[in-house]
Amino acid sequence: MTFMEFEKLRHGTELIKRGFARMQKGGVIMDVTTPEQARIAEEAGAVAVMALQAVPADLRKAGGVARMADPEIVQQIIDTVTIPVMAKARIGHFVEAEILEALGVDMVDESEVLTPADPFYHIDKTQFTVPFVCGARNLGEALRRINEGAAMIRTKGEAGTGDVSQAVKHMKQIQGEIRALAGKTKEELIMVAREIEAPIELVVETAKMQRLPVVNFAAGGVATPADAALMMRLGADGVFVGSGIFKAENPEKMAKAVVEAVNNYDNPAKLAEISKGVGAGMKGISADMIPVQEALQERGW
């Protein structure tokens, strides 16, 4: 495949953008803050890396305003690895997204991990040629983001905690709401669309497919190979790992183990071998201990 052919494949119409997102299915996407970390992620088998100024655990600890990563660092990461490079922009900050698109990132994450820029609106992602990924806690949030042009959805979870419980909650919430659509009449689906504030066309499509119209990855608190396998068993199309890699005792071993766990998520014996000797995971914090006003998952609507 030539460079130009790949450019056409990853950017463009909604169909092409969704197709590029689908190409990451079954893989692990890792948060990185430096070219060196990006290289570790690639060598471990990550399908893509996510560039940001600091991993969520550090952003949570530091407080203040969290913004997109320095474009120079993003460019260095792009130049360092051969796998796709994604980067985070603040909710509603379309200029950050435009800058990242101009840099040549493969996907933009309109992320609640960063400090939201717009208290009213998310980015109109249909105006971009680069695909977007967005977080969601329930079916309404997921379909609203897809209606805005998101090519991939991920659970919000509670980033930077190392506690997978919220990612589990959000994955089960979305899937439960999708199952509840089965067998409903058109009139009943219209009522559901009103209740969850989502376009009826997307509700009907989701009901027919019995899954989201785009890939749905797990994110937010995945910290061990077992966590990654759990999310795959629950129906995730792939896994984002943020602080769980580079806050672990041995990032290189943890990165490789998480990738292997996703590849062998339905094989307990293999998972047992994969999990041996990887070192301690990130210390983390229980998501239940975080006040609602400080929960990152509450950002966006």
From Swiss-Prot:
Keyword Lyase included in the entry's annotation: yes
Any one Gene Ontology molecular-function term assigned to this protein's record: pyridoxal 5'-phosphate synthase (glutamine hydrolysing) activity
GO biological process: amino acid metabolic process; pyridoxal phosphate biosynthetic process; pyridoxine biosynthetic process
Pathway per the UniProt entry: Cofactor biosynthesis; pyridoxal 5'-phosphate biosynthesis
PROSITE patterns, per the entry: PDXS_SNZ_1 (PS01235), PDXS_SNZ_2 (PS51129)
Binding site for D-ribose 5-phosphate: 31, 160, 221, 242-243
Binding-site residues, D-glyceraldehyde 3-phosphate: 172
Active site: 88 (schiff-base intermediate with d-ribose 5-phosphate)
Keyword rRNA-binding: no
Annotated NCBIfam families: PRK04180.1 (NF003215), pyridoxal 5'-phosphate synthase lyase subunit PdxS (TIGR00343)
Annotated protein name in UniProt: Pyridoxal 5'-phosphate synthase subunit PdxS
Gene label: pdxS
